[in-house]
């Protein structure tokens, strides 16, 4: 095999080794993100049907109900 062929094979080997290290880092990051997603809790809101129905007209969610006053928002936080 010529010197040029050996250099090309060496270069390909180095490129392969570098890309495999990068993939391992991405895999670790994906696993870490998956663990964080599993730890999150979902908040279940309990409001009356009247509140839900009044907010449906505005295409929003009933986030809070206080003495018959409904808080309708696109997204409920906290």
Swiss-Prot record:
Expressed by the venom duct. Residues 1-19 form the signal peptide. Coiled coil: none annotated. It is found in: Secreted. Its main location: secreted. The keyword Disulfide bond applies. It holds the Pfam family Conotoxin. Residues 20-44 form a propeptide. GO terms for molecular function: ion channel inhibitor activity; toxin activity. It comes from the Eukaryota. The modification Tryptophan amide is found at residue 77. GO terms for cellular component: extracellular region. Keywords: Amidation, Cleavage on pair of basic residues, Disulfide bond, Knottin, Neurotoxin, Secreted, Signal, Toxin. Disulfide bonds join 51-63, 55-72, 62-76. The presence of a 'disulfide through disulfide knot' structurally defines this protein as a knottin. Belongs to the conotoxin O3 superfamily. This is Conotoxin PnMSGL-01. It comes from Conus pennaceus.
